[in-house]
Amino acid sequence: MSFNSKNPFLSDKRFSSNAVSRAEEVHEAKIIDYNQEMTLSGTINKTAILFLILCGAAMVTWWMAFNGVNIMLPAIGGAVIGLILVVISAFKPEASPYLAPGYALFEGLFIGGISAIFEAMYPGIVINAVGATLVTFLVCLGLYKFKIVKVTETFKSVVVAATLAIATYYLISWVVSMFTSFTPVHYGNSMMSIGISVFVIVIAALNLFLDFDQIEKGVQQRVPKFMEWYGAMGLIITLVWLYIEFLRLLSKLSKK
């Protein structure tokens, strides 16, 4: 049985030649130039652009938070709008050149807000979370580049199954805690809670390998150039997830 990446932006179907052909047929007006192909360097450049946009937006809400400005509206609004843009892009990848920068902008507002909240509670936590995320990314990239870790179908199956299990658990826990006094086991700083955070971080990191693999396949299959934005957006989504999980883990360890 074949599994695709949990990230809707980085699924085999999205990067397949057949899917691209269908997109070309739909967009006969040539709004997107399908004659240009996705390249690795182009995807790297797009990822860097999105990262800079995200960091720039994050600095705005960070500055607001530490200067007495209420950040709830831009932070929550950014998260909601960012999610909406993710959903739209998942169904319309050809619009990624426009939606991806918007996602980075609004998600950055959310990241800046939540980072400021954690920093106020645990001074120094943000720089540690950023460092941990960067190191994890570089290690995973190195392991993938030198073929130390190979993305096989079994590897995909395990990572995707674990990711879906985490997403399901988070969703159920959130819904139940909203309507009952139940406290999910991943809350607090118990050993069980810390163990869950470590497990989630490992799975998030393993998703990076799926991201790298799908981007590489997109380049090999010579899909249209707009897929550079699509792939870059998917990679940023995984990095944001990883960063948030590091914030959670470090906050739990700080309480010990």
List where the protein language model places each region:
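A hydrophobic alpha-helical transmembrane-helix feature that marks the membrane cores
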Residues: M1-K256
